Every structure is written in C-alpha cells, then in structure tokens.
Amino acid sequence: SVVLFIGVNGVGKTTTIGKIGAQLRHQGKKVLFCAADTFRAAAVEQLGIWAERTGSGFHSKGQNADPAAVAWEAMDVAIREQYDILFIDTAGRLHTKSNLMDELHKIREVIARKHPGAPHRSILIVDATTGQNALQQTKIFKEAAGIDELILTKLDGTAKGGVAVAVSMQYGIPITYVGLGEKMEDLRPFNGDDFAKALLEQ
C-alpha cells in the first residue's frame, strides 16, 4: 500500500510519518519511508532519523534530487524487497504553487505507472493553529493531489481545531488522527466526541 503525505512546510509532516510508521512497525508491518521532499536538506535528514528510530526502511537521493524520480525508485525498492507499506514525504512550498502542483501530479503519475491504483491514500497534514488558511491549503492540495484523509497536528495546548471541522465538512474528508505533541504516543486516532467536547470547553 502506497501512501502520499502532503501539506505545507512546518505542519509536522515528517514527524507524523515517523509516528504512524512506528505504530505500524509495532503491528509487525514492513515499512519504507521515501524522502521526496528534496528541497529541504533538513526534511531528508529528519525522515532518515525517524526511519532509524522506528526500524523502517529509508529511500533517499539527498537534497535537490527530482522528487518523482525518488518516488519511482522507492516504488522499485518497495516491490523488490516486499515492503507492506510505502510512505512518501513530499514538499510543501505553497509560494511556488504551480511548481508544487506539477511536482505532485508527476509523483502521482509515476507511482501509478509502477503500481496501478497507487497512491492508495493521500493524507493532508494540517496544523490546527493555522485557522482559515487551512481551507485555502486544502483547496490547493485537493486540486494537486486529491485528499483521502486529514491529520490534525499541534492540537496540544489551547489550539482550536475548529478549522479542521470546517475543512472536513466543506470537502467531505474524514479526520483520522490528531497530533497532540512531539512524543511517539502523542499521535492518536481521532475521536469525534472527545474532540467536540474539547472544542466546547474552550
């Protein structure tokens, strides 16, 4: 199963991949991380650290490599070495919107060519503190890559996650996880009742 992670820089994409990877490793799954956010050296490095920490595979061509080529090669590795799940980390440079669109289209195209039906899921990571910006981000990423799920990060403290409800309802996308902090166990399955209660208490 191939999962594409999308979202603007700074929302906690790489950390979220690491945390979900850790949960899957605990379930005995063989997981491969692909560093297709090649514009930030820190992103490649950070994903590598998470791979090591979780005992996951790691595929990277370093900084400035062509993201679609990295994804294509990762597909090869995943198929050849029989990984259960491939997580692809992508760039989130919204200020270069058309480049970003092209890049995500290209990544989707090459992985679909490698494995019909891939990516099987496209997950948008949204920072709970971004407010109305999240709606605009969702619109752009939905056009570029399609979105199957939302994961809400930085919900720790007083951050109001109300915008996530707006995004979820407006675009009909389910929220699957919420990130409450930096630790491995701080990523939890989304519970609508708890969430509504927390929102109302604020």
PLM-predicted stretches and their roles:
Residues 1-202:
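P-loop/Walker A NTP-binding module and the surrounding RecA-like catalytic core of P-loop NTPases
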